[in-house]
Amino acid sequence: MERLQRLMMNTKVGAADANKDDTKETVYISSIALLKMLKHGRAGVPMEVMGLMLGEFVDEYTVNVVDVFAMPQSGTGVSVEAVDDVFQARMMDMLKQTGRDQMVVGWYHSHPGFGCWLSSVDVNTQKSFEQLNNRAVAVVVDPIQSVKGKVVIDAFRLIDTGALINNQEPRQTTSNSGLMNKANIQALIHGLNRHYYSLNIDYHKTPAETKMLLNLHKEQWQSGLKMQDYQEKETENLEATKRMVAVAQQYSKRIEEEKELSEEELKTRYVGKQDPKKHLAKTAENTLEENTVSVLTAGVNSIAIK
């Protein structure tokens, strides 16, 4: 009898774990969606902005975000009432006409300059989305702290209060994928792992998107024919000459000082310091290179004008 009870208890626990989310669950964001979120967030600084994410729930481990669109609301906080249902319905109808028939998988909003976490108002907004779909995702992006090559972004979902009451883990762990990212201390202060948990984020790029992004800041052959203003160039040359004179004087002074130093002292002479000889050579080389390019460009442009 006791064995049967243990088997029944294990079955219940297994069924409960099967319905839980997994730490391996990953939100895949496309390049166009990420660029739109960053552009929208940067345009709204210093106010918060919000929008909806379109995509699909591929399986229990994958949420695919294909595109996003902005909502006509901004403010210091985003409330449930700020979600314009009429605008959302019209926007979805227009997107379907263009072949974008994905469903709403969540929402995003910006935190300009103060990190990625959910406030109490954001938690209430996320509750309204999870009432429609319990797998809805809330993405927070910081356009101020984001720099080239490093996007400050995070995805969240609320923790079931029933699991907290029963002292259960909100998610089951089947791999180490969800344990690779270190939690932000600022998010922990604002309720991370108490009221909501963080999801893994990855970026999906098609071959066409990869080629487009590589060519985004690629210089063309016309870039070498652009002329710099002569007055600016003259000012730069004068400043470079002054720097070289100062470094040359410093170098001659160092030579006099080195005559009195031993070989052991000479080995550690410039450790952690600027070597005036190398600095002088580098400055002179850069100045000559820039002036040579400027003279050649001016000659090509003068011939082209004739």
From Swiss-Prot:
GO MF entry, a single one: metal ion binding
Sites where the protein binds Zn(2+): 109, 111, 122
Keyword Ribosomal protein applies: no
Entry GO terms, CC: cytosol; mitochondrion; nuclear periphery; proteasome regulatory particle, lid subcomplex; proteasome storage granule
Motif JAMM motif in this chain: 109-122
Keywords: Hydrolase, Metal-binding, Metalloprotease, Protease, Proteasome, Zinc
Residue ranges annotated for the MPN domain, each copy included: 27-162
Pfam family, one: JAB
Gene Ontology biological-process entries: mitochondrial fission; peroxisome fission; proteasome assembly; proteasome storage granule assembly; proteasome-mediated ubiquitin-dependent protein catabolic process; protein deubiquitination
Chain's role: Acts as a regulatory subunit of the 26 proteasome which is involved in the ATP-dependent degradation of ubiquitinated proteins.
Family: Belongs to the peptidase M67A family.
Protein name: 26S proteasome regulatory subunit RPN11
Taxonomic path: Eukaryota, Fungi, Dikarya, Ascomycota, Saccharomycotina
